[in-house]
C-alpha cells in the first residue's frame, strides 16, 4: 500500500482516486471548494462532476494544501493545464524532500507552448523532483468510476516512473501499458482535443459518417506532423495515447470538447456554449496554443487553423468548412 495525494477534485481526478483506493492505497484529495471537500468526506460522493457515483469510503479530502503536500511522496496532478504551474509552485514552497509527480492534464501552455511535464519540471526545484510521468489514453471518468474496462498508457522519461504508475493503477478493469515516448503521449492527449471540438461541430451540423471519418483521419495526420516535428515517435500516435484517445474523444457525449463542438455546430457561440456547460474545456486553450506553435514550427495544420478562426476570430462555421474543402489539390 502507498500513500497518494490527488491534487484536483474534477471528474477524472475523482475517478482515479477511486481506482487507487480500491487498489488498496491510502488516498487524500486536495481541492479549493469547501462544499466539494465536505461532500466527499461526509457522503463519499462528488456530485458536481460524477453525479451518482458512490466513491470508496476510505478516500479523504482537504482544502489544506500543506496537509495534502505532507501526506505522501506520490502526487497525482489532476488539474486543468492552466492551473498546473501555479499549484506546482505553491507545492514546491512546502516541500522538503523528493516527490514523484503523475499528471493527467491534456493541454499545452498558452504563453510558452510547453507540455504539462515541462511545466511541472519548471516549477519544482530539482532537489524536490523525484520524477514526472503522465497517465493518458481513452478513459472517460464516467466509465472508469463504474469499473467499465479501460486501457491507458503510462509514460515518463524515467522508466521506473512509468512502471510505478502501471503498478499503482492497474487492476482487473483498468489496464495500463508503459510507453517510453513522453513527448508523444502528452501531445497525443492534448492535440486530440482540437479535433474533438471539430468532430462535435460536424455532428452538430448534422453531417454524416463520411465527414466524421475524414475529419478524424486528417486530424490524426495533423497531430502526427506536429508531434514528429517536436520530437515524438510517429508510432505513438497509432497507440492508446494517440488514435485511441482521439476516437473516444471524437465520438462521445462524455467528452466536453465534443459537446462544445456540437453546440457550435448547432449555431451557438463559444461563449454561449461554455456558459451552458460550466466546465473547463481544455481544447479551447489548446487550439490557441497549437495554432501559434504550428506557425512557429512551420507545420501545416488546416483543421486547427479553421477551428482557431471559429473560436477566436468569429468566423462562421460554414465558412471555415468551405475553406477546408476548397483548399488546393494535394496528395494524401
Swiss-Prot record:
Q: Tell me, which GO biological process terms does this entry list?
A: carbohydrate metabolic process; glycerol-3-phosphate biosynthetic process; glycerol-3-phosphate catabolic process; glycerophospholipid metabolic process; phospholipid biosynthetic process
GO cellular component term, pick one: cytosol
Any idea what this protein is called? Glycerol-3-phosphate dehydrogenase [NAD(P)+]
This protein's record includes keyword Zinc: no
Cite the HAMAP family for this sequence: NAD_Glyc3P_dehydrog
Give the family from UniProt: Belongs to the NAD-dependent glycerol-3-phosphate dehydrogenase family.
The active site consists of 192 (proton acceptor)
List keywords of the entry alphabetically: Cytoplasm, Lipid biosynthesis, Lipid metabolism, NAD, NADP, Nucleotide-binding, Oxidoreductase, Phospholipid biosynthesis, Phospholipid metabolism
Positions that bind NADPH:
11-12, 32, 106, 141, 256, 280, 282
Which reaction(s) does the protein catalyse, per the Swiss-Prot or TrEMBL entry?
A: sn-glycerol 3-phosphate + NAD(+) = dihydroxyacetone phosphate + NADH + H(+); sn-glycerol 3-phosphate + NADP(+) = dihydroxyacetone phosphate + NADPH + H(+)
Cytoplasm among keywords:
yes
| InterPro entries noted in UniProt | 6-PGluconate_DH-like_C_sf, 6PGD_dom2, G3P_DH_NAD-dep, G3P_DH_NAD-dep_C, G3P_DH_NAD-dep_N, NAD(P)-bd_dom_sf
The UniProt function text for this chain reads: Catalyzes the reduction of the glycolytic intermediate dihydroxyacetone phosphate (DHAP) to sn-glycerol 3-phosphate (G3P), the key precursor for phospholipid synthesis.
Q: To which species is this protein native?
A: Staphylococcus epidermidis (strain ATCC 12228 / FDA PCI 1200)
Pathway connected to this protein: Membrane lipid metabolism; glycerophospholipid metabolism
Q: Which domain of life is it from?
A: Bacteria
Entry GO MF terms: glycerol-3-phosphate dehydrogenase [NAD(P)+] activity; NAD binding
Q: Where in the cell is it found?
A: Cytoplasm
Enzyme Commission numbers on file? 1.1.1.94
The residues that the entry says bind sn-glycerol 3-phosphate are 106, 137, 139, 192, 245, 255-257
